């Protein structure tokens, strides 16, 4: 199973093609729209969110509410395209006829963004040729793919949820004593998608302060997946390890700078006796762990405990009090360019990381249990659970 996305931030639309879903997966388009709306929400978002009202359109692969087994093509329109038709026109253009369009040319790269490296690599004179695709607007297409993946995982009893653990210097307390439903309920009631109400209020204050200063904020999101059977992934080769795939996928999200699974870097500072999860067995549960410091992964495979993964996101590169840069055509020092942007996109990043994680899990479920139809995959899944129960 894989997906591709296409589209620029201010182009006509974003397109996602998902290949490898079996036939017969029930699809709720309203659920995809809800995830798209969740991505657009969150305290600290910018003016673009007032323009876009993301809704998914199906171009292929779904009929009468179920997948066909053929590639699924999804489209999300960019409503802001109407304001950018000349700037983003695919037709040859000698000169802009609209003076406002000429002002959209970008020649001052932003520190922390793809602008300069992309211009050098692809030999672009206008940084817009880089920033349009590098923009996090592309993640709407990834959320559509991941939301579809969550619907594939649901019949297997697998659930995935993302929420915010920190923004700037404010860290939330771990959501102890709450099941996944309780965590989700608290997080979705928070303006910053944080299940800790006290920390949530302080995060809002930090975002307000950064906005006043013309600055931006990053943070850490946590994704939990429940209901995973042991044995997804493999220890046999590097590219079959689930933790490796998750790390690659999550680090590919715009502004992601670090990933840890379970106790992660904290475990590196402790002794083995304080890190590794002791194993137990009972007739009703089978094998289990007394703790979950490994975050549900050992040797590149799920071990039956909840998957817990955290992703660190740097502050957004666009600053309204810009840092030093240079004009790429003259090499003269100048303030970095400014694009319409968010102050903090960490609440949105929680949704994106949730959906990216869901797609990777769906990929490994499909690889493990196969099946050209959902029913065939579920039969294989049930057979595997019966095999495990006999151990």
Curated annotation (Swiss-Prot):
Tell me the superkingdom of the source.
Bacteria
One GO MF term on file is:
chorismate synthase activity
Cofactor(s) needed, names only, are: FMNH2
Residues where FMN binds: 133-135, 254-255, 299, 314-318, 340
Binding-site list for NADP(+): 39, 45
**EC number assigned by the record:** 4.2.3.5
**BP term (GO), one:** chorismate biosynthetic process
Reply yes or no: does the keyword Cytoplasm apply. no
Q: Does the keyword Lyase apply?
A: yes
Any matching Pfam family: Chorismate_synt
Enzymatic class:
lyase
Q: Which CDD domains match?
A: Chorismate_synthase
SUPFAM superfamilies reported for this sequence:
Chorismate synthase, AroC (SSF103263)
Spell out the subunit comment.
Homotetramer.
Q: Which purpose does this protein serve, as stated in its record? A: This reaction introduces a second double bond into the aromatic ring system.
Q: What is this protein called?
A: Chorismate synthase
């Amino acid at each position: 199973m894989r997906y591709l996305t296409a589209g620029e931030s201010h182009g006509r639309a974003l397109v996602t093609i998902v290949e490898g879903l079996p036939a017969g997966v029930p699809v709720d388009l309203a659920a995809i729209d809800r995830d798209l709306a969740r991505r657009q929400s969150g305290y600290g978002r910018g003016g673009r969110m007032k323009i876009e009202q993301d809704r998914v359109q199906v171009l292929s692969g779904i009929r009468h509410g179920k997948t066909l087994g053929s590639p699924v093509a999804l489209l999300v329109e960019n409503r802001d395209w109407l304001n950018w038709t000349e700037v983003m026109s695919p037709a040859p253009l000698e000169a802009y006829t609209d003076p406002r369009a000429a002002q959209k040319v970008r020649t001052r790269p932003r520190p922390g963004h793809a602008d300069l490296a992309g211009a050098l690599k692809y030999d672009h004179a206008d940084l817009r040729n880089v920033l349009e695709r590098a923009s996090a607007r592309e993640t709407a297409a990834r959320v559509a793919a991941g939301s579809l993946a969550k619907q594939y995982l649901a019949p297997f009893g697998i659930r995935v949820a993302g929420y915010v653990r920190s923004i700037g210097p404010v860290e939330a307390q771990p959501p102890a004593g709450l099941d996944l439903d309780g965590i989700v309920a608290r997080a979705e009631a928070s303006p910053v998608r944080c299940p800790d109400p006290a920390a949530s209020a302080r995060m809002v204050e930090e975002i307000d302060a950064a906005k006043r200063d013309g600055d931006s904020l990053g943070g850490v999101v946590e994704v939990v997946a429940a209901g995973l059977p042991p044995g997804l992934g493999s220890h046999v080769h590097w590219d079959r390890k689930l933790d490796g795939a998750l790390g690659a996928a999550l680090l590919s999200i715009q502004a992601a700078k670090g990933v840890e699974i379970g106790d992660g870097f904290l475990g590196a500072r402790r002794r083995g006796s304080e890190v590794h999860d002791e194993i137990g067995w009972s007739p009703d549960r089978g094998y289990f762990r007394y703790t979950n410091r490994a975050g549900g992964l050992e040797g590149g495979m799920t071990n039956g405990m909840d998957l817990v993964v955290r992703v660190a996101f740097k502050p957004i590169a666009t600053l309204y009090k810009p840092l030093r840069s240079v004009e790429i055509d003259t090499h003269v020092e100048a303030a970095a360019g400014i694009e319409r942007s968010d102050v903090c996109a960490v609440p949105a990043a929680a949704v994106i990381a949730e959906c990216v994680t869901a797609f990777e899990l769906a990929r490994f479920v499909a690889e493990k249990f196969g099946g050209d139809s959902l029913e065939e995959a579920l039969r294989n899944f049930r057979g595997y659970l019966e095999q495990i129960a006999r151990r």
